[in-house]
Design a protein with these regions (language model features):
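Active-site-adjacent beta-strand/loop module that shapes the phosphate/pyrophosphate-binding cleft
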Residues: 60, 68-90, 99-103, 122
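Nudix hydrolase/Nudix homology domain
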Residues: 91-127
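Conserved positions in beta-strands of structured domains
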Residues: 11, 64-68
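Short secondary-structure junctions
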Residues: 56-62
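Conserved Nudix-box catalytic region and its N-terminal flanking loop in Nudix hydrolases
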Residues: 16-51, 55
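Short, charged/polar surface micro-motifs in flexible loops or helix N-caps
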Residues: 11-16, 25, 40, 73, ...
Length: 127
């Protein structure tokens, strides 16, 4: 049975996307992903995402809507469009680097496999 993971698709006012590079101590080291994590038992997906972003990035978000859900290997990744409600994050407990990336440059990053379906939906709308 796949492990459910939630992720936040966050854009800044210039339209750049928040991308996070996995630390070399994590599975899929040095791959890029949208920030998020695993829900706790009985926790709503949206609540889990708010909690994970606060824990990992010390940032506050509002979850707006589900964007994509796909199962890749052992991961059931549920991506939500989110909005920052405070300052932009600058550090992460789970990532070695944070970067605000323009849409045109997203495909240049080396992405973790579970994030690829959501990335494709961003780059090729209506697919």
């Amino acid at each position: 049975m796949p492990i459910t993971v939630v992720a936040a698709i966050i854009q800044d006012q210039a339209g750049n996307y928040l991308c996070c590079k996995r630390g070399d101590w994590k599975a899929s080291p040095n791959k890029w992903e949208f920030p998020g994590g695993k829900p706790e038992a009985g926790e709503a997906l949206e609540s889990a995402l708010v909690r994970e972003i606060k824990e990992e990035l010390s940032a506050e978000i509002t979850v707006l809507r589900q964007f994509d859900r796909s199962i890749t290997g052992e991961i059931d990744l549920v991506c939500f469009v989110c909005e920052l409600t405070g300052p932009k994050p600058t550090t992460s407990t789970d990532h070695s680097e944070l970067r605000w990336v323009p849409e045109a440059e997203l495909s240049k990053l080396d992405w973790a496999e579970p994030d690829l379906p959501a990335l494709k939906r961003i780059l090729i709308p209506f697919c």
